[in-house]
């Protein structure tokens, strides 16, 4: 997938990228299938397995914090003391940044709202109320895909690209990485919604 993406960036076609995406999707589907079989139908997820999954999630979150720490470091390193190569000013000359009070502010509100709705879904599940959980999870997924759509529109309307100085690089890498997380999160939440609808719950 990484090699295919790099090849596509350098105009070598997207066949390898599509094959990588197909392989990743197949892996995700079969992994979800195995998790459902082992936990819901076979009862193989013991307390030790649950603890391992919790630790895995915590370590994953720590690794993501490190990722975004690096992105913010790059941004502040470049913006607080601009190099003479970019005119010693921030943003660089001929770079017209997006208005933070338009789509970025709306996307922030959407993400905060999705946090509220997914918390609603969690508390509904803990209270054994399936219908409110289904409704709130559907709202969360819809907000996630709406965020992705607005992010795409923001990229289309931007007057700069990823190759336009350090500003374009840090902007598109940081926001693109974040947008990728939203897409992956929305996909996983969609799988959770399917499991809620199919009543894949244990007695505990």
From Swiss-Prot:
<protein>
    <recommendedName>
        <fullName>Cytochrome c oxidase subunit 3</fullName>
        <ecNumber>7.1.1.9</ecNumber>
    </recommendedName>
</protein>
<dbReference type="InterPro" id="IPR024791">
    <property type="entry name" value="Cyt_c/ubiquinol_Oxase_su3"/>
</dbReference>
<feature type="transmembrane region" description="Helical">
    <location>
        <begin position="101"/>
        <end position="121"/>
    </location>
</feature>
<keyword id="KW-0999">Mitochondrion inner membrane</keyword>
<dbReference type="InterPro" id="IPR013833">
    <property type="entry name" value="Cyt_c_oxidase_su3_a-hlx"/>
</dbReference>
<dbReference type="InterPro" id="IPR033945">
    <property type="entry name" value="Cyt_c_oxase_su3_dom"/>
</dbReference>
<comment type="function">
    <text>Component of the cytochrome c oxidase, the last enzyme in the mitochondrial electron transport chain which drives oxidative phosphorylation. The respiratory chain contains 3 multisubunit complexes succinate dehydrogenase (complex II, CII), ubiquinol-cytochrome c oxidoreductase (cytochrome b-c1 complex, complex III, CIII) and cytochrome c oxidase (complex IV, CIV), that cooperate to transfer electrons derived from NADH and succinate to molecular oxygen, creating an electrochemical gradient over the inner membrane that drives transmembrane transport and the ATP synthase.</text>
</comment>
<dbReference type="GO" id="GO:0005743">
    <property type="term" value="C:mitochondrial inner membrane"/>
</dbReference>
<keyword id="KW-0472">Membrane</keyword>
<comment type="subunit">
    <text>Component of the cytochrome c oxidase (complex IV, CIV), a multisubunit enzyme composed of a catalytic core of 3 subunits and several supernumerary subunits. The complex exists as a monomer or a dimer and forms supercomplexes (SCs) in the inner mitochondrial membrane with ubiquinol-cytochrome c oxidoreductase (cytochrome b-c1 complex, complex III, CIII).</text>
</comment>
<dbReference type="GO" id="GO:0004129">
    <property type="term" value="F:cytochrome-c oxidase activity"/>
</dbReference>
<dbReference type="InterPro" id="IPR000298">
    <property type="entry name" value="Cyt_c_oxidase-like_su3"/>
</dbReference>
<keyword id="KW-1133">Transmembrane helix</keyword>
<dbReference type="GO" id="GO:0006123">
    <property type="term" value="P:mitochondrial electron transport, cytochrome c to oxygen"/>
</dbReference>
<keyword id="KW-1278">Translocase</keyword>
<keyword id="KW-0496">Mitochondrion</keyword>
<feature type="transmembrane region" description="Helical">
    <location>
        <begin position="56"/>
        <end position="76"/>
    </location>
</feature>
<dbReference type="InterPro" id="IPR035973">
    <property type="entry name" value="Cyt_c_oxidase_su3-like_sf"/>
</dbReference>
<feature type="transmembrane region" description="Helical">
    <location>
        <begin position="171"/>
        <end position="191"/>
    </location>
</feature>
<keyword id="KW-0812">Transmembrane</keyword>
<feature type="transmembrane region" description="Helical">
    <location>
        <begin position="12"/>
        <end position="32"/>
    </location>
</feature>
<feature type="transmembrane region" description="Helical">
    <location>
        <begin position="133"/>
        <end position="153"/>
    </location>
</feature>
<comment type="similarity">
    <text>Belongs to the cytochrome c oxidase subunit 3 family.</text>
</comment>
<dbReference type="Pfam" id="PF00510">
    <property type="entry name" value="COX3"/>
</dbReference>
């Amino acid at each position: 997938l990484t090699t295919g993406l790099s090849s596509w960036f350098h105009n070598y076609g997207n066949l390898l990228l599509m094959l990588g995406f197909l392989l990743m999707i197949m892996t995700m589907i079969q992994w979800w299938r195995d998790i459902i079989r082992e936990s819901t139908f076979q009862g193989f997820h013991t307390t030790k397995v649950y603890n391992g999954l919790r630790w895995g999630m915590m370590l994953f979150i720590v690794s993501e914090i490190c990722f975004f720490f690096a992105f913010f470091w790059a941004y502040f390193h470049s913006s607080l003391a601009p190099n003479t190569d970019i005119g010693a000013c921030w943003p660089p000359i001929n770079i017209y940044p997006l208005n933070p009070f338009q789509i970025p502010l709306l996307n922030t509100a959407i993400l905060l709202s999705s946090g509220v709705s997914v918390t609603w879904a969690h508390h509904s599940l803990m209270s054994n109320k399936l219908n409110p959980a289904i409704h709130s999870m559907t709202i969360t997924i819809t907000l996630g895909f709406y965020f992705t759509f607005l992010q795409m529109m923001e990229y289309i309307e931007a007057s700069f690209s990823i190759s336009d100085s350090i500003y374009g690089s840090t902007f598109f890498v940081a926001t693109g990485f974040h947008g990728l997380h939203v897409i992956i999160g929305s996909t996983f939440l969609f799988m959770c919604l399917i499991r809620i609808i199919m009543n894949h719950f244990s007695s505990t």
